[in-house]
């Protein structure tokens, strides 16, 4: 789960880190009111969980409440990398002396936490690694030992602050908070970029990112609730699929894929790629899928504006071919207004009954997956 910036900053604040005053706004009127409350200039920041907001026009500076209002009218509803802006975080502008980078990740190879620190900030760590790799400091933390003073000293010294200074103490607080968030919230990433030294000499996180392990969300009901209320980085189709109970991942192609089992579904995608097509999605209905689940899966792709062809590839064990066929038939009966072509390869339990049902409604059937994939690609190019 990717937290919005305002949510990540709330965690930083909860763990004792000073951040610039700011509030969340859902309308232009709220933006103006917040700007009046905290004082201008302010920064308007689109709350979408993707990198590169600034370059996409998702971060603006306003000198007056009225300017903030006018800018926000243009920002609400804008599309940034496929995500629609529905929230703006309005925060006090901070004059910056210099920008730094600090993140904490899990290094799976060493089974340790890993701090990445650089005196260069405000750009992606990948860009720093490419242009100035010597500027990146790596500090490993063994979880069985925990964060120690020598870890903190190593990081702060690299960032260029003197022991005993105000900046040293403030940076230490940020490092400690990041580590506690990482552990307490089962995070995969905690990052501040830039970590700024202000003109007043204070060390302040101007941006914050936190990614929490989805498998640990059951331990954090507040985050689970927030995810239900705001799906954030998942599309409307992914949100619907999750609600129904099948595994769905959005891609950028035009051939819809439905399979049973992750391995078969991925192999089906590979076949489509092999024959020159582009999958629109990964959709695994799972083992033993019912007629109802199949119907909802097919409806997702029938309603998807980018999908031209739906390729259903089923190998039935506990998944019955007749149930799959009836699900396809039901979906087509419910979604009458569509222009999609459907290609089916179906084998296994109750195969003959399933094929008979599909033949009655004119669905093309194929004996092997290769021929079915070729046909799907061919139809998508028409």
Swiss-Prot record:
Cofactor binding note from Swiss-Prot or TrEMBL: Binds 1 Mg(2+) ion per subunit.
Binding site for substrate: 260, 317-319
Pathway assignment: Carbohydrate metabolism; tricarboxylic acid cycle; succinate from succinyl-CoA (ligase route): step 1/1
Coiled-coil region: none
Entry EC no(s): 6.2.1.5
List of residues binding Mg(2+): 193, 207
Domain of life the protein comes from: Archaea
Catalyzed reactions: succinate + ATP + CoA = succinyl-CoA + ADP + phosphate; GTP + succinate + CoA = succinyl-CoA + GDP + phosphate
Domain ATP-grasp: 9-240
GO cellular component, one term: succinate-CoA ligase complex
Cofactor(s) it depends on: Mg(2+)
GO terms, biological process: succinyl-CoA metabolic process; tricarboxylic acid cycle
A molecular-function term among this protein's GO annotations: ATP binding
Protein residues bound to ATP: 45, 52-54, 94, 99
InterPro entries: ATP-grasp, ATP-grasp_succ-CoA_synth-type, ATP_grasp_subdomain_1, Succ-CoA_synthase_bsu_CS, SUCC_ACL_C, Succ_CoA_ligase-like_bsu, Succinyl-CoA_synth-like
Family: Belongs to the succinate/malate CoA ligase beta subunit family.
NCBIfam families per the UniProt record, alphabetical: PRK00696.1, sucCoAbeta
Function: Succinyl-CoA synthetase functions in the citric acid cycle (TCA), coupling the hydrolysis of succinyl-CoA to the synthesis of either ATP or GTP and thus represents the only step of substrate-level phosphorylation in the TCA. The beta subunit provides nucleotide specificity of the enzyme and binds the substrate succinate, while the binding sites for coenzyme A and phosphate are found in the alpha subunit.
Subunit structure: Heterotetramer of two alpha and two beta subunits.
Protein name, per record: Succinate--CoA ligase [ADP-forming] subunit beta
Organismal lineage: Archaea, Thermoproteota, Thermoprotei, Thermoproteales, Thermoproteaceae
Gene behind the chain: sucC
């Amino acid at each position: 789960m990717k937290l919005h910036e305002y949510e990540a900053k709330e965690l930083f604040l909860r763990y004792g880190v000073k951040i610039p005053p700011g509030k969340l706004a859902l309308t232009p009127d709220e933006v103006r009111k917040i700007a009046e409350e905290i004082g201008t200039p302010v920064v308007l920041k689109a709350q979408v969980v993707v990198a590169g907001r600034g370059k996409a026009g998702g971060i603006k500076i306003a000198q007056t409440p009225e300017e903030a209002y006018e800018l926000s009218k243009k920002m609400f509803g804008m599309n940034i990398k496929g995500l629609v802006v529905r929230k703006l975080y309005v925060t006090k502008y901070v004059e910056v002396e210099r920008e730094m980078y600090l993140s904490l990740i899990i290094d799976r190879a060493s089974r340790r936490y890993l701090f990445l620190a650089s005196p260069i900030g405000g750009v992606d760590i990948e860009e720093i690694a490419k242009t100035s790799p010597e500027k990146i400091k790596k500090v490993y933390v063994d979880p069985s030992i925990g964060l120690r003073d020598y870890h903190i000293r190593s990081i702060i010294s690299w960032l260029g602050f003197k022991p005993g200074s105000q900046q040293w103490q403030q940076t230490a607080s940020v490092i400690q908070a990041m580590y506690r968030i990482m552990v307490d919230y089962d995070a995969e990433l905690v990052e501040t970029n830039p970590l700024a030294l202000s003109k007043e000499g204070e060390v302040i996180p101007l941006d914050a990112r936190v990614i929490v392990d989805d498998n640990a969300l059951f331990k954090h009901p507040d985050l689970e609730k927030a995810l239900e209320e705001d799906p954030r980085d998942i599309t409307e189709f992914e949100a619907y699929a999750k609600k129904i109970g099948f595994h769905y991942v959005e891609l950028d192609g035009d051939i819809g894929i439905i399979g049973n089992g992750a391995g078969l579904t991925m192999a089906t995608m590979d076949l489509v790629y092999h024959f020159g097509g582009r999958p629109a999605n990964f959709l695994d209905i799972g083992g033993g899928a019912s007629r109802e689940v199949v119907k909802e899966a097919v409806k997702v792709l029938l309603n998807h504006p980018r999908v031209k062809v739906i390729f259903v590839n089923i190998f039935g064990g506990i998944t019955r071919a007749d149930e799959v066929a009836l699900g396809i038939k039901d979906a087509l009966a419910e979604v009458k207004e569509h222009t999609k072509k459907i290609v089916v390869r179906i084998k296994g339990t109750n195969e003959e009954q399933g094929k008979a049902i599909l033949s009655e409604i004119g669905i093309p059937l194929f004996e092997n997956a290769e021929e079915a994939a070729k046909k799907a690609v061919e139809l998508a190019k028409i």
